[in-house]
A protein has these predicted regions:
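N-terminal accessory regions of nucleic-acid-interacting proteins
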Residues: 1-15, 19-73, 77
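Conserved DEDDh/DEDDy metal-dependent 3′-5′ exonuclease domain
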Residues: 47-75, 79-201
Length: 201
């Protein structure tokens, strides 16, 4: 089954303003001029590092919790680019208000359509979605609605559009990215990597 194109949204992140005598769209970011200059480093999730889901019962519990959550879902995937051929996901991270953060090892399952079903109709938030959507699709995961924070940052004209840079510029938080190019096929995954992964959503 070919995935349908998600509805891509940038609402809430950017808005257009036009002058009566000027038909050019000017894109601005809410609160951009009032950024906090002091950056606060984030080194651990406020609700701790979750256990990695590796069992069917854990996956079912995760799906039920995500379905019971509210609002959009932050989604990310970690690969082993540079270490293995292909773009397979070796860890999937999801966070949704009311359900918490979930780290899923896709290796024992191969198919995560139960998670996709739990998020049916929910807007997904990804950064640089074009990098993660192919590997998520291989797992049976595809959003109905999508908000790409990298695309929003580009539309807003931010000088740097990497996830850590966007978070620093707009929220005043420092996000460590030292494990982004790690070999995520490694098992077991080291605890610092899991902490990094949980902070990524």
């Amino acid at each position: 089954m070919t995935p349908q194109n998600p509805e891509i949204s940038t609402a809430g992140a950017v808005h257009n303003t036009t002058e009566a005598a000027d038909t050019t769209a000017h894109i601005t970011v809410e609160g951009f001029d009032s950024l906090v200059p002091e950056v606060i480093d984030l080194d651990a999730p406020r609700d701790g590092v979750p256990l990695v889901i590796e069992t069917q019962s854990g996956l079912e519990r995760c799906a039920a919790a995500l379905a019971a959550g509210h609002g959009p879902a932050g989604v990310d995937a970690e690969r082993a680019s540079g270490f293995r051929y292909g773009q397979r996901a070796f860890l999937v991270q999801i966070r949704r208000e009311g359900s918490g953060t979930w780290l899923i090892d896709p290796e024992p399952f191969g198919d995560l359509s139960i998670i996709n079903d739990a998020l049916r109709g929910v807007e997904w938030i990804l950064h640089a979605a074009s990098q993660d959507l192919p590997c998520l699709s291989e797992l049976g995961m595809w959003p109905d609605k999508l908000f790409d924070t990298e695309l929003a940052a580009r539309l807003a004209g931010l000088p740097r559009v990497g996830l850590a840079a966007v978070i620093e510029q707009l929220l005043g938080f420092g996000l460590a990215k030292e494990h982004s190019a790690a070999d995520w096929s490694t098992r077991p995954l080291p605890e610092p990597w899991l902490r990094y992964a949980a902070l990524d959503v």
